[in-house]
Design a protein with these regions (language model features):
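Non-catalytic, usually N-terminal nucleic-acid engagement modules in DNA/RNA processing proteins
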Residues: 1-174, 333-370, 429
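Glycine-rich phosphate/ribose-binding loops and adjacent secondary-structure elements
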Residues: 2, 176-344
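Short, solvent-exposed loop/turn segments at secondary-structure junctions
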Residues: 55-56, 103-105, 136-139, 189-191, ...
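A generic structural signal for short, solvent-exposed coil/turn residues
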Residues: 89-91, 176, 233, 379
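Charged, low-complexity, helix-prone segments enriched in Lys/Glu/Asp/Gln
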Residues: 154-169, 193, 410-421
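C-terminal accessory extensions appended to soluble enzyme cores
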Residues: 275-429
């Protein structure tokens, strides 16, 4: 079971100055930056996935901060996706380089943003090893398996269109000599309809199926989908789970013969989760999660800046508290200060970033923040990690502040998660 990371142009400045919070002088975005697989050894994933919607704009495709520029798209197609992502060379020769359409980006549109020929040409030109047929997401999944006649026109349209696209995509792949391994995108409104679509795609010639629409589903529903799917398709047919948001529960799904799955969850949680920002193995076959220590930049954090503009906060006072909080944490890390004064210095600044709602809500939020902070400082997980990120930057990895720290923490999470998946596989053999 291979773990693929879905690329969102996540790279960091290897020479970033954490003391001044500045990039290296003359640093050029991308060219001087490094991806997780360049910063860490071993590589923190088994392959990469790139969504066409992140690379190529089209009518109806939602805009994104991680959208490739026109010049980046041209370079990717000219040099190939492996070279562009610097995921080339003998080390990555056998690693999956998978493409999909990024159907979330056009989910509100009547039809997919790209047709089968456009998608094929994108995969072939960029030299992907695997490519998913264009699909249209169906979000609902009813485990009661309602019949086709009970479904609305929109659901049936998306279901039938996804199958039609898969048929045309396979026809093109066959006529062009299969420059990559085609993967059939499977959608459905129930476990039974998903299984039936999968069987239809097997008959088209697909030997690798990519199961979509899983993101909003609960774990027990995904179990039902995979159980029904495996009861219908051939034993040798490979399964990929698209955008598997339940990555922390992957150990529950080893019995379904899953070949691969992709997820951004370990990296995204580094800066999007309220309390699970830093991963560590718990020694019992699972993972522990720690809250990062939030010390935002006083003159760049949106909430603090809003308070400054409204005259609620004094910028000089905020910066003094910010400086004290950072100094206290670094002194604690060096062993020259205890937990309690460190907590007080950080909370003295944190209270301003927590201001929202009424006094009672603020008070409850601050109590939770303090409890998470005390746990993180008591257990000092960054001191117990020997990954390349933690070994080099130390306590900076646990500070929730600036993209260069937060992404590094995400890289650490990818490495810990990849090792977690490998341990699960070893136990299941």
């Amino acid at each position: 079971m291979k773990f693929l990371y879905s690329d969102t142009q996540d790279y960091v400045d290897p020479e970033y100055n954490f003391t001044t919070d500045r990039n290296a002088p003359g640093r050029r975005r991308y060219w001087d930056d490094v991806y997780a697989h360049e910063l860490m050894a071993p590589t923190p994933y088994d392959g990469l996935l790139v969504a066409m919607s992140a690379v190529r704009s089209a009518p109806g495709v939602a805009t994104s901060k991680v959208r490739y520029s026109t010049s980046e798209e041209q370079r990717l197609l000219r040099d190939g996706v492996r070279k562009f992502l610097r995921f080339d060379g003998p080390k990555y020769k056998e690693a999956m380089m998978m493409g999909d359409c990024g159907s979330f980006a056009y989910v509100e549109q009547e039809k997919p943003a790209y047709d089968a020929l456009e998608v094929f040409e994108f995969y072939a030109d960029a030299c992907f090893t695997h490519g998913v047929s264009p699909d249209h997401i169906i979000f609902a999944c009813d485990v009661d398996n309602p019949p086709r006649e009970a479904m609305g026109a929109e659901v049936l349209y998306r279901y039938d269109l996804t199958l039609e696209n898969a048929r045309e995509f396979m026809r093109i792949c066959e006529s062009e000599g299969f420059p990559f391994e085609p993967m059939g995108a499977v959608q459905g409104w129930s476990p039974q309809s998903i299984a039936e679509a999968a069987v239809t795609m097997e008959k088209m010639g697909y030997r690798y199926l990519a199961i979509g629409g899983l993101v909003p589903l609960k774990v027990e529903v995904i179990h039902q989908v995979l159980k029904t799917l495996r009861e219908h398709i051939k034993v040798e047919t490979k399964i990929h789970l698209l955008g598997f948001a339940k990555a922390d529960s992957i150990q529950e799904f080893t019995g379904y013969g899953i070949t691969s799955f992709d997820s951004t969850s370990p990296l995204i949680r580094a800066f999007m989760d309220e309390k699970a920002n830093y991963y560590m193995p718990n020694g019992k076959g699972g993972l522990d999660y720690y809250a990062a220590i939030r010390i935002p930049q006083a003159t760049e954090n949106p909430r603090l800046m809003q308070g400054i503009k409204r005259g609620i906060f004094n910028p000089e006072d905020l910066q003094r508290r910010e400086t004290r909080a950072l100094a206290a944490l670094r002194q604690f890390d060096q062993g020259s200060q205890g937990i309690e004064p460190t907590v007080e210095a950080i909370m003295d600044y944190q209270q301003f970033a927590t201001l929202s709602g009424d006094d009672e809500k603020i008070g409850k939020n601050l109590i939770k923040v303090r409890q998470r902070l005390e746990r993180t400082l008591t257990e000092t997980p960054w001191k117990n990690c020997d990954c390349d990120v933690c070994a080099k930057v130390g306590v900076e990895v646990i500070i929730f502040r600036s993209a260069n720290r937060n992404r590094r923490r995400g890289f650490h999470n990818l490495g810990i998660y990849h090792q977690h998946v490998q341990r699960i596989l070893e136990k299941s053999r």
